Amino acid sequence: MWKEFKEFAMKGNVIDLAIGVIIGGAFGKIVTSLVNDIIMPVIGRLVGKVDFSNLYINLSGQQFNSLQEAQAAGAATINYGLFLNNLINFLIIAFSIFIAIKQINKLKNFTKKKEEVQVEATEKDCPYCCTKIDIKATRCPHCTSVLEEATN
């Protein structure tokens, strides 16, 4: 059983997935910091010194000075400021992944086209029986017709 697990864990796809998850987690933290510490304070400053993470709708009817006070008191709140932060966070990550995948696909298509250009024909059609034959053949192995000229 240990041997099977070891073979499974050492396959390239599993290791690639693990590396992707680790890098993705780190990337997510960087983007979250970018949104919370750089982008949202600038946007908040532009729209009148608003801290978006502190924007909420109080559903309890009581008065609170901040979201933290409302949550500490157990009040029901709609935290639309945190939602906006998370939405911007998601959009940045989604756009970054879109750009990365677009570049990877472009690279794959470039190498695929390069490989297609290098492929040379190795077969031709017999003009008499229309079967595929070797391009260097001087006689068709199927219908035994003599071919005029071997093309290279």
Curated annotation (Swiss-Prot):
Pfam families: MscL. The chain crosses the membrane at residues 14-34, 81-101. One of its GO terms (cellular component) is plasma membrane. It is found in: Cell membrane. It is a multi-pass membrane protein. HAMAP family: MscL. This is Large-conductance mechanosensitive channel. It comes from Clostridium perfringens (strain 13 / Type A).
